[in-house]
Regions:
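Active-site acidic/histidine proton-transfer and metal-coordination neighborhood
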Residues: 1-69, 166
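Histidine-acidic metal/acid-base catalytic patches
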Residues: 21-25, 50-182
Length: 182
């Protein structure tokens, strides 16, 4: 319910950021170089639009001992937003180029319904193209970030029998983009 009230939502976000600030103080004492937070897809989970995520990131630039960086998920962003950029991973990459430390990769469909693998079936319908993501990273002049496959399967059949094959196919789909120096 708190996210439905702008005043209470802001207060809760600020409380969360204050907790992160305390974690940054501890993190600096144990040698961490940064902390991560991940913008999500719905208001209840925060950071669902570029504007909302930027607001939180701005709060995180105030008094942190170590920086708060972003874990950007190519499939996040609020599909109910009136701004089409809020579901465009390339816009997010360009906008947060100075804050991205990690990018979660998964195939993204219009329904935003899962952590889809990079298999022929999903790639035909999906919007995540490796070279386009890498081009956006390069154009944003991001010097270093970790790209992580974040693929999961429903714990149901027939998906259960496909897990390893889908993971292998996903790795093979991305492999040429990392072995060629692109």
């Amino acid at each position: 319910r708190d996210y439905e009230s702008p005043e209470i939502r802001t207060k809760r976000i600020q409380q969360g950021v204050e907790s992160w600030k305390e974690l940054s103080e501890y993190g600096s004492t144990i040698g961490l170089k940064y902390l991560l937070w991940e913008p999500m897809s719905v208001p209840r989970e925060v950071g669902e639009t570029i504007q909302s995520a930027q607001r939180i990131q701005d709060f995180c630039k105030q008094g942190f001992t170590i920086p708060m960086k972003l874990c950007l998920d190519v499939d996040h962003g609020d599909v109910s937003s009136c701004n089409p950029e809020d579901t465009d991973p390339h816009t997010w990459i360009r906008h947060f180029k100075n804050d991205i430390q990690v990018i979660h990769l998964k195939q993204s469909l219009q329904d935003k319904g899962g952590h889809y693998p990079f298999t022929k079936e999903y790639n035909l319908r999906g919007k995540i193209v490796p070279q386009e993501i890498l081009n956006s990273i390069k154009e944003a002049n991001i010097k270093s970030c970790s790209l992580i496959l974040e693929i999961s399967h429903r714990e149901r059949y027939p998906f259960e029998s496909r897990v390893l094959a889908d993971l292998k196919e996903s790795v093979e789909y991305w492999r040429p983009y990392f072995t060629c120096g692109c």
